[in-house]
């Protein structure tokens, strides 16, 4: 709320008992008054997607829109309303359960691959934060859609989302079976390698079997070198994890930056969130050296790998303590840290 007005044009759709109408809004001031040409039940803002900002529907429209957005025939309007709802979800105007239910209902009917892809991208947030029973139901619904959805690209995206986000025993057993039998026909070698990494984190008792078998499946020498570098980050052996982290503090061990970022992200995976808090401060202290010795984009990738998966108050305090200890930290790097830590800060705003 900085008192800034963005002059802009966008459509507002008026939904009445007998008909709908689209009005063009020309927003030039902080307040814009529109005439209603007939009795209106629902007012849908920014249905052409051109508007910039958080559009908050009225308290009557928002729950109706959450239940009915997927019935919008026009693809552009449907995508725009989906994005509007996502922004209202981020603003905490409805619950994880309401949002996930709306997304899954929409996904089951969606015929546009781009909109389906947007929906699947949005599923990740509630998958992380839903209560256990509801999360398990959601995972099972996603598995069903990964086998039955009419859009092939949607089926593989769902499976990849489950690989990254599923945590229930039932889901992990399904994924383990897919990995063991290599039965996910849409999955490629990289997908199976990622699945082995994730299962090693989620099922530490199977880690040795997973990593040994997956390594035997790889034939390409470059992929074997990559595997040998990254797989050290998914072992349950904490001494190995700490040794790997210490090695990443040295520039010569960060030469292949995509591998480094992937390893750092697995070191800070949600499956070991409480353990990895101790990595936050030293990795932030190393950021200036990362900038000095690496590619121009590497500092951003480094802090994303380090912070983007953390949500705990302890992790939040580590970042705050770093800033308190470095009041004159370079602004560009500080902003990169804050951008990567945005989900962490959101999760701890009220705490």
Map each language-model feature to its residues:
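Non-catalytic accessory/interaction domains
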Residues: 1-226, 232-234, 238-241, 246-351
């Amino acid at each position: 709320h900085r008192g800034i007005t963005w002059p802009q044009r966008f459509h507002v759709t008026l939904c009445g008992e007998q008909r709908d109408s689209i009005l063009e809004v020309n927003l030039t001031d902080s307040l814009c008054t529109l005439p209603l040409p007939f009795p209106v039940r629902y007012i849908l803002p920014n249905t052409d997607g051109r508007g910039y900002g958080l559009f908050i529907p009225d308290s009557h429209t928002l729950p109706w829109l959450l239940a009915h957005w997927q019935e919008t025939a026009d693809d552009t309007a449907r995508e725009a309303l989906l994005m509007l709802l996502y922004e209202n979800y981020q603003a905490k105007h409805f619950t994880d359960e309401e949002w996930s239910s709306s997304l899954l209902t929409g996904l089951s009917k969606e015929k546009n691959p781009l909109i389906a892809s947007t929906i699947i991208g949005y599923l990740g947030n509630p998958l992380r934060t839903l209560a256990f029973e509801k999360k398990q139901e959601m995972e099972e619904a996603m598995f069903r859609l990964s086998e039955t959805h009419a859009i092939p690209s949607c089926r593989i995206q769902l499976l990849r989302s489950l690989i990254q986000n599923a945590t229930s025993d039932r889901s992990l057993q399904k994924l383990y079976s897919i990995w063991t039998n290599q039965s996910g026909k849409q999955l490629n070698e990289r997908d199976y390698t990622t699945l082995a990494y994730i299962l090693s984190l989620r099922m530490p008792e199977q880690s040795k079997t997973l990593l040994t078998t997956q390594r035997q499946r790889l034939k390409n020498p470059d992929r074997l070198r990559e595997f040998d570098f990254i797989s050290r980050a998914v072992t349950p052996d904490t001494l190995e994890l700490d040794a790997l982290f210490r090695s990443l503090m040295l520039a010569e061990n960060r030469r292949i930056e995509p591998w480094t970022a992937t390893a750092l992200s697995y070191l800070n995976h949600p499956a070991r969130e409480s353990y990895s808090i101790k990595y936050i401060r030293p990795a932030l202290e190393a950021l200036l050296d990362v900038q000095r010795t690496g590619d121009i984009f590497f500092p951003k990738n480094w802090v994303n790998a380090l912070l983007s998966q953390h949500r705990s108050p302890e992790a939040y305090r580590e970042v705050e303590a770093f800033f308190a200890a470095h009041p004159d930290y370079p602004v560009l790097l500080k902003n990169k840290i804050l951008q990567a830590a945005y989900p962490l800060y959101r999760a701890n705003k009220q705490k």
